């Protein structure tokens, strides 16, 4: 039994779980026999595949595409997602396709994998172990976990969980950034149970004692229900003393399979944990565990098997990479200016490069030699992760933790027309159903009370009214804060009251879709912009960007507004790149006076870099800040004008406090983030919530509310219009009109909120499968061309997408519109036409021209683009092929349910997409084409909808193949002719001083012409070359000149050699070119080099040319000619037919003499305007095919028509008196 061999390849510990699967799949051997019966020669398989393909469908051969041998394979097999060539599986492709479909129908993904295993074991037994490891074992392990989950819960894994499982079994470490309710903790508990049963040691790290208990119970429940043998140890602060002691003893001795603790245990016991040799580390809610310090990252890595010195080396490497890019940019700036410091910076850059190489080699050796644990970081938000310390994880484990998005919103916003007061808040809380409330007090409210004081008063008032409320602010002890949040999550606390601070723990860090139902704002969230800024304000990039953004909205002058918004936008981009960039910028401008800083706005970045002794990269940012300060100072120089503009704007208010004046603007970001706590993404979609904003009938407050509504509508749009309660709002003078929401409508909205929370509860309790919600049911891989586009697409759905560093590229991950989305880029074309075999890389198979492609690459030395070779044919350098990138894309494809090819929506993009499709290899995923015409949230969302998915457009692909073949057959052939005809002559005279008189003489064969002669200069020169005049003296070309600039003197000449006297592209004859030179009258021996100009190109064949070719081909097919060759000596005429059984008319053999041949030859050589004497024309002077003009004979109009329509052979037949047709 072939499947018995598969069982032998299963890693120890898992075999008892695999055997039932193999027993269920025993019928696959019968299916395999059906395929084996169609065995035939590989060439016959390919011929059949090509011959049976519709003529309208593109067909090609792709080199380096077989997943087994790495050889070439036909697109017929590759686009059938088989991925194995005809030599490795010499069976009928159509039968194989049908049987694979049947195997999947019977046994799912694992059925396909095992069927392929049986066939590979039969035909390619030497490669079966590699095939099992890469393709079969991931599916088998996923099936194991799936069946365990089914036995324990009655549910099967859903798509994202299958992706995580496949990724884990392949030995990857990775991060999971997925919404609450998508089953991260369930999946982690499940794989922990399976790994523990197989004898692998697992460490499950969680942030709280509550989660320790939950995970412990879940793992033990899985083990009990699925009959797994798993020894679980949990440790937390709430355990009895004796239980703690026993747990510590078992941990110290390693007497467990799965260990579950909080992060506090990790902090205090890391030395004990790093001795235990874990196989898998699961970090649940990673942002909570590493919040506030990166040292927990180091501790996790130590437990994974790394030494602290190695972790520090990884951190040093991440720091050096940033330093490298900074130095590189600075060096370019110094070199451009000719600054003498360039050599010092260049030496430092070399030192940094050397250290980077050493550290990369060290870490590569560590990862190869050390048996490190796999690490999985899980998070619903990821927002609080300290990215600088996590750079260590990127260097060691090739992935990054991302951050979730805040753009998803399903909220009804309601303006409550009432003076903010505890009583007003209580009324709204009761109207909203009490439980699940978040009350936010904005900062800088009118009055003397601070926001923190109001928070405490509100909480106290609600508690005295019978509503369980807790206050949370910066002064709340961490334990009380955690207790309040846990109580809110469990339903013991009704309401949380907090400050609406953009960085508050409730505003940014609360992700409880099952608990948070509604939000109440104790006034409109706002920011204040000082209209009389201090010097330290103007040197703060955040203040300048914020002030410019808000003041720009007040301006009616479109050009001025656009200018301010442009500067503010550039500053925001700098700020968002990271704290360290802002710190460097502030450090650079700190010593400068404001006047000096503003003067830098008009200076060149290179001058700024020299003045401040910084790199050009930072100098550009300093210039941007200086420009912002100048614009802001100019605008704030007239406070009365600013106040007048604010009055006209109707969306902001001016607030005066003593001698200080402030501009109050709505804080949209804080409002969106805070209200977003009641509308969270989970496995069933986005929860519905309510947001109430208390606002008094005061014009200044209403202006701020109006600004909030308008900016929110402009920035995000809204599915629901703002409403007002308990009455309508009509302020036409400021453009604010809101429709009243009735008590009945409000009650209906509250019911909708409750229904949504019940659905969340069922998903979290396992009573409702994620698939039953219709959302997040599938994992998708989107393939685009540009890396920037890939990053932008993922960023549309996530603040900071998770990143996986691939071999040759980067993949980005995010939850997007019901899909677990991974985006990767091809970085342009991945394949191109080879030069051989066939006719310039085009084969003839079964009466069809079939192009052959191979993987593209680029020479690391000369930059030459190379196809299918690891050695550059131009310079012999090493070629960096795209094979590693394609292998990585194959790995990603093996994890996905659906693959979306999102290359550019044109013929070239279609062809790139088709090439990638062919290189996907063997995959169980469905492959579709999707298009988008704008990289916006709306554009990508449309492309991700299933109704937008389609097949690759065969017509577009065929059009691009035709264009490329035409380029090769015509353009490439013409280019080779150019290489034969044009030669490059280089004459080096060596180092010469300025003022030297030079004479150069060229003696070249007759018929060779010098079409260009010039002096070339080195790369550092601003002028790369200068034309030099040649004179003809007898048989020689002569140059006489005095050089004004000394240095290395080199001349180059372009020679036109139509008769190829100097050789061709395959070799030249330099001895035929004689060069004599003298300097200041003294002969010198120049260094002379002659070579074909192989860098010349005839260019691409454009569409009109293709049209002409198609028209001529059609005429050729529709025109019948006799094909023959005439050999004439003397009186004997021999006709040799080039087609069988050609019947040659007797008249032709009688009249085709030497004179006729001479006439025809001259017309063939000179064309229809060829002229003849009367003697040359002979007996044809009287025919209608010739006419006489000025004593000479040439073809008549009738003769020209014959020549044009029937060619020279047709004219020959007419001259012989025989019909040309």
Swiss-Prot record:
GO terms for biological process: DNA topological change. ATP binds at residues 161, 178-185. Mg(2+) binds at residues 785, 904. Its EC number is 5.6.2.-. Its cofactor is Zn(2+); Mg(2+). One of its GO terms (cellular component) is cytoplasm. Residues 424-600 form the Helicase C-terminal domain. It comes from the Archaea. One of its GO terms (molecular function) is zinc ion binding. It catalyses: ATP + H2O = ADP + phosphate + H(+). The N-terminus is partially blocked. Binds 2 zinc ions per subunit. It is found in: Cytoplasm. A motif (DEAD box) lies at residues 284-287. A zinc finger (RG C-terminal-type) spans 856-882. Signal peptide: none annotated. Zn(2+) 2 binds at residues 859, 862, 872, 875. Its main location: cytoplasm. Zn(2+) 1 binds at residues 66, 69, 85, 88. The keyword Isomerase applies. A zinc finger (RG N-terminal-type) spans 56-97. Modifies the topological state of DNA by introducing positive supercoils in an ATP-dependent process; dATP also allows positive supercoiling. Increases the linking number in steps of +1. Only this subunit binds ATP, it does so in a DNA- and RgyA-independent manner. Hydrolyzes ATP only in the presence of DNA. The RgyA subunit transiently cleaves a single DNA strand and remains covalently bound to the 5' DNA end probably through a tyrosine residue. It changes linking number in steps of one, and nicks DNA preferentially at 5'-CNNN | 3'-sites with a strong preference for 4 pyrimidine residues. This subunit expressed in E.coli only has DNA-dependent ATPase activity at 80 degrees Celsius. Reverse gyrase activity is reconstituted after incubation at 80 degrees Celsius for 5 minutes, positive supercoiling requires ATP and Mg(2+). In the presence of ATP it binds and nicks substrate but does not make closed product. Heterodimer of an RgyrA and RgyrB subunit. The topoisomerase domain is shared between the two subunits. In the C-terminal section; belongs to the type IA topoisomerase family. In the N-terminal section; belongs to the DEAD box helicase family. DDVD subfamily. This is Reverse gyrase subunit B. The gene is rgyB.
């Amino acid at each position: 039994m072939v499947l018995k061999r598969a069982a032998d390849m299963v890693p120890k510990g898992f075999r008892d779980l695999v055997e039932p699967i193999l027993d269920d799949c025993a019928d696959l051997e019968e299916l395999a026999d059906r395929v084996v019966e169609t065995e035939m020669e590989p060439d016959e398989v390919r011929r059949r595949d090509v011959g049976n393909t519709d003529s309208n469908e593109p067909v090609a051969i792709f080199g380096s595409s077989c997943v087994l041998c790495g050889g070439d394979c036909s697109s017929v097999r590759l686009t059938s997602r088989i991925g194995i060539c005809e030599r490795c599986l010499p069976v009928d492709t159509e039968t194989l396709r049908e049987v694979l479909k049947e195997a999947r129908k019977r046994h799912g993904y694992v059925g396909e994998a095992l069927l392929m295993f049986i066939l590979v074991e039969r035909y390619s037994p030497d490669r079966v172990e590699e095939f099992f490891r890469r393709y079969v074992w991931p599916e088998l392990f996923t099936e194991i976990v799936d069946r365990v989950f089914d036995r324990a819960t009655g549910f099967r894994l859903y798509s994202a969980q299958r992706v995580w499982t496949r990724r884990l079994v392949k030995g990857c470490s990775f991060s999971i950034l997925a919404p609450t309710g998508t089953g991260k903790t369930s999946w982690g508990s499940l794989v922990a149970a399976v790994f523990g049963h197989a004898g692998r040691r697992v460490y499950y790290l969680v942030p709280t004692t509550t989660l320790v208990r939950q995970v412990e119970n879940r793992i033990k429940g899985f083990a009990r229900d699925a009959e797994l043998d798993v020894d679980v140890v949990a440790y937390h602060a709430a355990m009895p003393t004796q239980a703690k002691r026993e747990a510590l003893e078992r941990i110290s001795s390693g007497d467990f399979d799965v260990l579950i603790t909080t992060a506090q245990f990790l902090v205090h016991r890391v030395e004990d944990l790093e001795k235990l040799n874990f196989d898998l580390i699961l970090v649940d809610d990673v942002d909570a565990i590493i919040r506030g310090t990166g040292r927990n990252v180091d501790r996790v890595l130590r437990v994974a098997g790394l030494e602290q010195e190695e972790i520090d080396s990884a951190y040093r490497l991440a720091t050096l990479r940033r330093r490298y890019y900074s130095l590189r940019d600075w060096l370019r700036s110094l070199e451009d200016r000719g600054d003498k410091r360039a050599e010092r910076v260049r030496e430092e850059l070399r030192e940094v490069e050397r250290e980077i190489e050493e550290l990369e080699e060290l870490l590569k050796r560590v990862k190869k030699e050390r048996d490190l644990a796999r690490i999985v970081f899980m998070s619903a938000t990821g927002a609080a992760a300290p990215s600088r310390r996590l750079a260590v994880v990127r260097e060691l484990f090739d992935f990054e933790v991302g951050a979730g998005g805040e753009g998803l919103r399903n909220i009804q916003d309601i303006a409550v027309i009432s003076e903010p007061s505890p009583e007003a808040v209580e009324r709204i809380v009761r109207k909203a159903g009490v439980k699940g409330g978040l009350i936010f007090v904005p900062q800088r409210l009118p009055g003397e009370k601070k926001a923190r004081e109001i928070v405490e008063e509100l909480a106290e008032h609600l508690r005295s009214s019978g509503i369980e409320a807790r206050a949370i602010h910066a002064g709340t002890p961490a334990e009380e804060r955690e207790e309040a949040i846990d109580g809110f999550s469990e339903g013991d606390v009704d309401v949380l009251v907090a400050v609406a601070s953009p960085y508050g723990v409730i505003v940014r860090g609360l992700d409880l879709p099952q608990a948070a139902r509604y939000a109440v704002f104790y006034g409109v969230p706002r920011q204040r912009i000082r209209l009389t800024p201090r010097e330290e304000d103007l040197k703060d990039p955040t203040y300048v960007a914020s002030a410019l953004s808000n003041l720009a909205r007040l301006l009616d002058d479109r050009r001025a507004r656009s200018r301010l918004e442009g500067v503010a936008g550039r500053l925001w981009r700098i700020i968002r790149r990271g704290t360290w960039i802002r710190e460097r910028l502030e450090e650079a401008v700190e010593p400068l006076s404001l006047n000096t800083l503003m003067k830098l706005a008009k200076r060149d970045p290179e001058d700024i870099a020299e003045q401040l002794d910084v790199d050009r990269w930072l100098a550009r940012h300093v210039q941007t800040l200086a420009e912002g300060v100048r614009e802001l100072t100019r605008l704030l120089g007239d406070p009365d004008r600013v106040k007048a503009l604010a009055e006209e704007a109707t969306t902001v208010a001016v607030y005066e406090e003593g001698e200080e004046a402030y501009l109050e603007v709505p804080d949209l970001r804080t409002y969106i983030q805070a209200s977003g706590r009641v509308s969270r993404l989970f496995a069933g979609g986005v929860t519905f919530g309510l947001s109430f904003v208390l606002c008094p009938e005061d014009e200044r407050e209403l202006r701020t509310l109006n600004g909030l509504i308008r900016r929110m509508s402009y920035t995000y749009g809204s599915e629901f219009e703002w409403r007002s309660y308990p009455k309508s709002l009509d302020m036409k003078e400021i453009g604010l009109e809101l429709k009243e929401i009735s008590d009945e409508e409000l009650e209906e909205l509250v019911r909708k909120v409750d229904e949504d929370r019940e659905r969340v509860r069922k998903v979290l309790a396992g009573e409702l499968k994620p698939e039953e919600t219709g959302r997040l049911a599938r994992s998708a891989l989107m393939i685009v061309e540009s890396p920037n586009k890939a990053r932008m697409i993922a960023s549309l759905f996530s603040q900071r997408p998770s990143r996986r560093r691939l071999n040759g590229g980067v993949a980005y991950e995010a939850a997007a519109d019901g899909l677990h989305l991974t985006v990767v880029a091809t970085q342009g074309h991945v394949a191109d036409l080879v030069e051989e075999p066939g006719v310039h890389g085009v084969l003839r198979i079964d009466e069809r021209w079939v192009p052959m492609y191979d993987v593209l690459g680029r020479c690391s030395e000369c930059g030459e683009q190379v196809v299918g070779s690891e050695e550059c044919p131009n310079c012999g350098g090493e070629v960096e092929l795209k094979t590693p990138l394609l292998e990585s894309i194959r790995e990603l494809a093996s994890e996905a349910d659906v693959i979306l090819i999102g290359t550019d929506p044109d013929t070239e993009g279609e062809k790139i997409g088709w090439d990638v499709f062919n290189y996907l290899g063997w995959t169980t995923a469905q492959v579709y084409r999707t298009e988008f015409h704008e990289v916006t949230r709306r554009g990508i969302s449309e492309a991700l909808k299933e109704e937008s998915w389609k097949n690759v457009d065969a017509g577009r692909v065929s059009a691009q193949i035709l264009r490329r073949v035409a380029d090769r057959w015509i353009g490439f052939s013409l280019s080779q002719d150019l290489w034969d005809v044009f030669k490059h002559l280089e004459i080096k005279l060596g180092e010469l001083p300025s003022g030297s008189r030079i004479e150069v003489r060229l003696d070249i064969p007759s018929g060779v012409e010098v079409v260009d002669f010039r002096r070339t200069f080195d790369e550092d020169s601003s002028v790369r070359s200068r034309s030099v005049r040649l004179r003809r003296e007898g048989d020689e070309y002569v140059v006489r000149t005095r050089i004004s600039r000394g240095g290395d003197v080199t001349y180059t000449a372009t020679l036109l050699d139509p008769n190829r006297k100097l050789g061709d592209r395959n070799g030249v004859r330099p001895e035929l070119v004689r060069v004599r030179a003298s300097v200041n009258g003294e002969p010198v021996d120049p260094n002379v080099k002659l070579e074909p100009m192989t860098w010349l190109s005839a260019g691409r064949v454009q569409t009109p040319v293709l049209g002409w070719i198609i028209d001529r081909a059609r005429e050729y097919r529709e025109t019948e000619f006799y094909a023959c060759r005439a050999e004439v000596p003397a009186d004997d005429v021999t006709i040799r037919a080039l087609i069988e059984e050609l019947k040659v008319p007797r008249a032709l053999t009688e009249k085709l003499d030497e004179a006729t041949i001479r006439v025809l030859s001259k017309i063939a050589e000179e064309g229809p305007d060829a002229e003849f004497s009367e003697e040359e024309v002979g007996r044809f002077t009287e025919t209608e095919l010739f006419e006489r003009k000025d004593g000479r004979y040439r073809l008549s109009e009738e003769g020209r028509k014959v020549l044009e329509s029937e060619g020279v052979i047709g004219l020959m037949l007419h001259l012989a008196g025989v019909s040309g047709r």
